[in-house]
């Protein structure tokens, strides 16, 4: 049946209307188009994968590469050049996440108020410029200042990832995309490790005009700037503005997303959704889970090169020994991310991942043979699995744009707290074995297992309660009433487990 003239308006016009009147575009289109069959659904999903995911993956890779520069630099001369003594190096990682934590919540509101891809690209370019300028530092204080500023600029990126994935993919599709994004951290580690080793070899040949760690910052910074520019040009702020979709495809993408009963959200800030998030026990579970899994991450992300060197590997060999961890990370996270495509049991995956993490931590802490400890370091590449589960849960198990942004920011504060604490578990008085830090990894992973079980129990119980009540959205509700409903407000919403 042909549309009437009134119905046959363009998605572009509605996108503009949504932007001006703060209306939820997905709700406006919800009932305007036919049911999407499996073939069409696959086609739309594939097109999104081809046009949106690649640049998001590059952001993830370069972000990890940028954060890892301090780890590589720790054995490339930066501690000597900047006269670091005692526990001063610990504060390199802590200062980064201090800036990240303090500004994560206020800066994430920019994603709510302004175009998503434009804000994201601006911060990427800014952090790339700062990375490049880090080559100019000549004191410990100035280096700590740049790391703090870098943390501030990168605090926007993870909440942006959550929103990008939520506005382009359905709930059951989000876990793999989030896992694949984080898996690209592994490729970032491989690229950074390769560059570091190459610079180390050039240094041995006396072919460098400045310290290798300074050149490393220049290269990673310039790559990041270029990527930020491409984000600005290539990725649309929302599906209704996608230059790579036809008008009909834009309509269908929005219809496809609306089947989750979550819409694309309103750009209007809603205080009641923040209050609702504060009443949601999941937010606190996500927060403490982030702390538990981030403490080992914060420690090893900054000290793995030093610890590998202390196992007996020379500088160049220590840089190479970091690379298998990155390879395992990319392969394992990609494979683990595919499992929910068939079973949709992400909490089971989190528990399996944490069991492997616990094994990794135990090998690092208690194994005597060097090769067993090395195996523990390599298995650490699987450690982001619970982190992915948290991001995926926030993306798919919280509805309402303001609530989603707020819960993501609070979760990232927990992530920052853990990453701030992690480097501080490495005390110079315990060098070179750092046994206290290693034992803390084991304790944290045990705590994380109990929190994952609690999240699973909360979601299963609530789904059963809603199934028993068997309530539906009233047909008498106006479009205004249906806009930007939260998961608490929408009785048809079900939590993914």
From Swiss-Prot:
GO cellular component, one term: cell tip
Pfam families membership: MFS_1
Name of the featured protein: Uncharacterized transporter C1773.15
InterPro entries in alphabetical order: MFS, MFS_dom, MFS_trans_sf
Protein's organism: Schizosaccharomyces pombe (strain 972 / ATCC 24843)
Family to which this protein belongs: Belongs to the major facilitator superfamily. Allantoate permease family.
Compartmental location: Golgi apparatus; Membrane
PROSITE patterns named in the record: MFS
Single GO term (MF): transmembrane transporter activity
Membrane topology: Multi-pass membrane protein
